[in-house]
């Protein structure tokens, strides 16, 4: 029920948010906006009084940020410029996350979450992209999602639930290629034990970075 409510929030921003987001309609491909070193937006989901999923002492907003910090550190080590939508435990509205991404002139955005379901048997990784009517944006986002999924599965050995289309605000209303990664189910006991291990989060982060690099490589001719 909690996850359903949170998904509805992602799908249907408030009227104030919607008014702000209507400004952002033009897609900017990575090739057009990256003159040199690529800039990447990393979006740790939830924060502040928005906990996301909570199972025992494991809170999604905390794991989202921890994983995002690992991703950011690896990207910076590889020479990328990184912009985080939040760097600490604070609430950031969906509209503000989208605004930041759209003003950043970044190459792409990755939003990081962990999953929940009523069924305790649900497990595995999901990556979402928006099925945009603008074919170029849809193709870029799907390509990014496919590559990230490939590398993440290789490193984590997790089950794949596939690359899917989604109508989440943070991937729908951004002007750059954007994906939302669900790194596993906190409601599955076996998967929760893995997620609680730091090495799993580091492997997940490395897979995300490897996928980003593979996506950007042909654009930079390297």
Regions found by a protein language model. Give the residues of each.
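Catalytic-site microenvironment of enzymes
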Residues: 1-222
